[in-house]
């Protein structure tokens, strides 16, 4: 089975390429040059299509038609931690419009589309939201991701949240935390999270491709909830870094997702957070060797 991962150099994309390559014929697109990422040993040159601008519809169409994949995985998006997230045009183009364009192109080549949404479609005032709850985000990022949810045709949209290592950037929680060696950071005891490390989420995606080819529509995919303070303590423990984590109780937000529907259909049972962080920290990928 041929898989096309769009956005292969991103935090999720590169883990999908790593995890899926053992079982599938995996192709990927990246915005830059593959030579810049050669030290990681992740990308096969002949299956990596470099310098792809997905906002160029002609280029995107040519890539999909030439690869002719069975499954297209959309790992492209503007995340809220980057400056581009303040640019409404760029955010809407990638988070809202691109998934629908991909759904159209997937239908044309007879492929299944898997795309990722976020727990941030909810404002965080109430946790354990289900697929039946109406998204109520108030910020551009959350609204743009909601608009990009594709629930018709051959598309599967997974609402979730991810943490993980990055290839040369420091936008997200794990890289931020590891960059604070020898310092003190705040751990939010009332910030509730139910996502996954990218390594684990890639395992979930592999299972969906292998064993649940019929799954379509919108599903919440979540772990058992943890607060950010306890999460940082686990990161400190398994990465073996000297960082003081200070309890901070005042900030309150709960974007935990109820994934009962997904678990019933797929028989999915999440690993414990202790196990997931231990697995993530043991990843041999040489992230720290990258010239930032």
Q: Where are the model-predicted features located?
A:
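Mid/C-terminal beta-alpha module of Rossmann-like enzyme folds, strongest
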Residues: 202-207, 211-259, 288, 292
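SDR active-site strand-loop-helix element
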Residues: 6, 29, 75-76, 113-119, ...
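Amphipathic terminal alpha-helices
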Residues: 273-292
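NAD(P)-dependent short-chain dehydrogenase/reductase
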Residues: 138, 150-193, 199-200, 207
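N-terminal Rossmann NAD(P)H-binding glycine-rich loop of SDR-like oxidoreductase domains
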Residues: 1-23
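NAD(P)H-binding glycine-rich loop region in Rossmannoid oxidoreductase-like domains
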Residues: 48-94
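Catalytic helix-loop patch of NAD(P)-dependent Rossmann-fold dehydrogenases
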Residues: 93, 97-101, 120-158, 162-167
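N-terminal Rossmann-fold cofactor-binding loop
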Residues: 28-39, 53-54
